[in-house]
Regions:
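HhH-family (HhH-GPD) DNA N-glycosylase catalytic core used in base-excision repair
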Residues: 1-172
Length: 172
């Protein structure tokens, strides 16, 4: 890559990989739960559930994503893991974010509950296992899996700024 392009990419990274830029971004939700977890007020599973849904909702205008994630976490009483494990989810054919309906959220909650009944963390799941087992999508070797890879980046990479780095057993 030529030096000018590298310099431009680094400049953009310095501008956009900044907490200020991400205050109104889907990562704000798992970040909030990671901060609560660090203080012992929530657990890693809260961070994981928040990351699953924030990544799932991460398409469209950021202001809409943040608004709709806020509605979702209000429904969860800001205790996402407890909400999932209770097994009583809002299950309506009404949209919560764009084309995502509450019934789809309930289905993901059901798969998360089933997973967490036998496992401590989502960290060991492959991209395909997450795609099929958590998001309920068909296997597709050619799928870009953008939301899953974005979520994994949040959870694995620890840049000291934006990404959380809470999954310590996975190398970035």
């Amino acid at each position: 890559m030529n030096k000018e392009i590298v310099a431009q990419l680094r400049e953009w990274a310095d501008i956009y990989n900044d907490l200020q830029y991400f205050q109104e971004d889907p990562i704000a939700f798992p970040t909030r739960f990671a901060e609560l977890s660090a203080r012992g007020e929530r657990c890693l599973k809260d961070v994981e559930v928040a990351a699953v849904f924030a990544a799932h909702f991460a398409w469209g205008r950021r202001s809409m994503i943040v608004r709709d994630c806020g509605r979702l976490f209000d429904e969860m009483d800001w205790r996402p893991y407890d909400y999932v494990m209770r097994g009583v989810w809002r299950d309506e054919a009404v949209s919560v974010h764009r084309t995502i309906k509450w019934s789809e959220v309930a289905a993901i909650c059901g798969r998360l509950k089933e997973f967490y009944e036998g496992h401590e963390s989502l960290e060991a799941l492959t991209v395909n296992e997450m795609r099929v087992g958590i998001f309920g999508q068909k296997e597709d070797a050619k799928a870009p899996n953008k939301k899953i890879n974005m979520m994994r980046r949040w959870m694995v990479r620890d840049d000291g700024k934006v990404d959380l780095g809470v999954w310590k057993g996975t190398s970035p």
